[in-house]
Amino acid sequence: MLLRSAALCRALLARRGRAAGLCRRCVSSLQVANEPVLAFTQGSPERDALQKALKELKGRTEAIPCVVGDEEVWTSDVRYQASPFNHGHKVAKFCYADKALLHRAIGAALAARKEWDLKPVADRAQVFLKAADLLSGPRRAEVLAKTMVGQGKTVIQAEIDAAAELIDFFRFNAKFAMELEGEQPLSVPPSTNSMLYRGLEGFVAAISPFNFTAIGGNLAGAPALMGNVVLWKPSDTAMLASYAVYRILREAGLPPNIIQFVPADGPTFGDTVTSSEHLCGINFTGSVPTFKHLWKQVAQNLDRFRTFPRLAGECGGKNFHFVHRSADVDSVVSGTLRSAFEYGGQKCSACSRLYAPRSLWPQIKGRLLEELGGIKVGNPAEDFGTFFSAVIDAKSFGRIRKWLEHARSSPSLTILAGGHCDDSVGYFVEPCIVETKDPQDPIMKEEIFGPVLAVYVYPDEEYKETLRLVDSTTSYGLTGAVFAQDKDVLREATELLRHAAGNFYINDKSTGSVVGQQPFGGARASGTNDKPGGPHYVLRWTSPQVIKETHGPLGDWRYPYMQ
């Protein structure tokens, strides 16, 4: 519910001295809170609804079109999305947009831009607030089921992603956008100054990943909320859930041409949008090579753009847990198991390297191996006791298997547990822990994006040197955690690891950021660190205009010193 702040509106009116036209832009206070994460216990209404939705998807293939304007477009370039844990089940049949259709989508978006941008932010926000309500209520089970079946997520991983986080993105972004309207420059009589937060001039290309349904909704949704028009290229391996999110936005009142839903071949999409003079932004989550390629394409075409495109990218990480000898072992073990192996290590923030002190390693190792035996890997749609499921596709499976082959063949690496792979039914990889004698081995440096945890054991007295090693080993800077009870060590670690992580955790796991609480993102090779989930992110998708109005004659053109 939008609560109008009459007092603040009156204050703004008095300060600016021009009542006409300002009420439309008066600041609103939107009260929001994080969406509760449902438990899905036996016999609960949410569990019953989810099981019903999963049953409806069993053996079903949904046909998904490109949507340009208000028209569903079916092309001859047909693709399929397979369920990761049962690749014989094609969950979606969709078609790729070619260059001609993408150009048509650009034209349709541009035609709608001016009217959408001129709408008051409160009106645009209502669309996303309604979408959040639909996700929170009648459409929750559908989106969760499609995320589980299509992307291989367990109940809880789907819930914290496709429900809680996406709902939070829509609600908090609406709050941040409306509060931004209240950020106005100082006015000094006889003039009043105001700031208009316009959308960008052109279209934004949103390119989303497979691993979070919420990220796709936010990459397209946040720029649209701020008055922009968007071409959304969803991931081939998240098509089912992405299309559901798009339909919910339309059901919530999003006009037809604001977000164009255009599945496409990656290079075709990239070439087309970066060659358009109207490109004004790219909102991206994916691999470093892809983002670098898009950046280079923008640079090569710089002279043709009407405006400098905004480039926002999140590109993953090689995230760490550093353990000091003063750490609580229970916290280390529980936090590391969750961070490294939830969703099969396919989170951008997943812990992929652990630095353990020699004095604690026997205890930590014993506990990790003991608990690892209780992790169930399987079909999350049929067994709610599954901790994680298959990795996303054959390409990912093959890449992870090569890392495991490296672990078996390298003299500096020892597989302590797990590592078996089986792709006969789904793309299953056992959780694997690898100990290394070489802290510079590639397994400690490069992103794996799978259920593989690399461990380096360091001498206790060399913890400062090891902290420097943590900072310098990889090119990434996304997330990391330090486990210690010694306050001096925590202070030293915070200073030495200042640029090693954009999201830094103390005595907590490296995953699990919450919208509004821990805005997410990192620098270095991890991206542009624009912090979606925080108040500054929406500003990224605006082009502010300052208006000065002087109330009275300007007087003599001559300066006093000239007399």
Swiss-Prot record:
It catalyses: L-glutamate 5-semialdehyde + NAD(+) + H2O = L-glutamate + NADH + 2 H(+). It comes from the Eukaryota. SUPFAM superfamilies: ALDH-like. Residues 1-24 form a transit peptide. Transmembrane segments: none annotated. PROSITE patterns: ALDEHYDE_DEHYDR_CYS (PS00070), ALDEHYDE_DEHYDR_GLU (PS00687). InterPro entries: Ald_DH/histidinol_DH (IPR016161), Ald_DH_C (IPR016163), Ald_DH_CS_CYS (IPR016160), Ald_DH_CS_GLU (IPR029510), Ald_DH_N (IPR016162), Aldehyde_DH_dom (IPR015590), P5CDH/ALDH4A1 (IPR005931). The keyword Amino-acid biosynthesis does not apply. Substrate binds at S513. NAD(+) binds at S208, K233, G286, S287, V288, P289, T290, E447. PANTHER family: 1-PYRROLINE-5-CARBOXYLATE DEHYDROGENASE FAMILY MEMBER, DELTA-1-PYRROLINE-5-CARBOXYLATE DEHYDROGENASE, MITOCHONDRIAL. This is Delta-1-pyrroline-5-carboxylate dehydrogenase, mitochondrial. The lineage of its organism: Eukaryota, Metazoa, Chordata, Craniata, Vertebrata. The gene is ALDH4A1.
